């Protein structure tokens, strides 16, 4: 079983700790309107968990909590997951199943490589995504629909502006993943969990190398 990077508990904690060991200037880059839209979404999620304010604070305390003392990408992903109330990860679930089945798990990138990629995400892309927080619910619904339909091209088009869809995150990493996958797949009885943005590039490299690649949908 191949995964993009290490997914064990210790590695996940190191990523979280690293994300908490930085700063950002997101509050100064975002308009007050954008900040309050995010604050409203965060408060709505908190209200659903029974944390309703009798008299709501006049300052964006949730936004401040999520953006204080963390790296830009850590702030974004924390806000994104909280606003959408989406704690799931297909990669992590695949890893857990593989461990339970006692399968050999291979990380295609080191933790250090993955952290470097996260730090390289342009802040401008993060700001742009946060500016569009009002449309996140619609984005999530469209994403799920396209995913369930197996519409890869539709997903690529929908998510082209997402923070991790730039050339820094894709591109070179596709080649790296292909090089790790190839000998493992040649040996047989293998599966790889990768983010869908990598699928076009990786499958292209496999086809160029003479492999037959077929999309299978339920």
Which residues does each predicted region cover?
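Structured, acidic catalytic/metal-binding patches in enzyme active sites
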Residues: 1-165
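A cross-kingdom marker for long, charged
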Residues: 163-218
């Amino acid at each position: 079983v191949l995964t993009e990077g290490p997914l064990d508990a210790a590695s996940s904690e190191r990523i979280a700790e690293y994300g908490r060991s930085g700063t950002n200037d997101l509050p100064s880059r975002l308009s007050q309107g954008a900040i309050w839209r995010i604050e409203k979404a965060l408060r709505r999620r908190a209200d659903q968990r029974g944390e309703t304010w009798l008299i709501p604070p006049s300052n964006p305390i949730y936004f401040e909590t999520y953006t204080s003392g963390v790296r830009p990408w850590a702030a974004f992903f924390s806000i994104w997951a909280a606003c959408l109330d989406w704690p799931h990860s297909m990669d992590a679930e695949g890893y857990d199943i593989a461990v339970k089945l006692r399968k050999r798990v291979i990380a295609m990138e080191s933790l250090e490589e993955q952290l470097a990629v996260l730090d390289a995400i342009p802040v401008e892309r993060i700001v742009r995504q946060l500016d569009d927080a009002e449309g996140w619910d619609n984005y999530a619904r469209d994403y799920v629909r396209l995913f369930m339909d197996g519409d890869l091209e539709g997903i690529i088009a929908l998510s082209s502006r997402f923070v991790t869809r730039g050339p820094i995150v894709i591109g070179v990493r596709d080649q790296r993943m292909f090089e790790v996958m190839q000998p493992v797949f040649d040996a047989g009885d293998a599966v790889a969990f990768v983010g869908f943005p990598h699928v076009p590039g990786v499958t292209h490299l496999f086809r160029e190398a003479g492999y037959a690649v077929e999309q299978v949908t339920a």
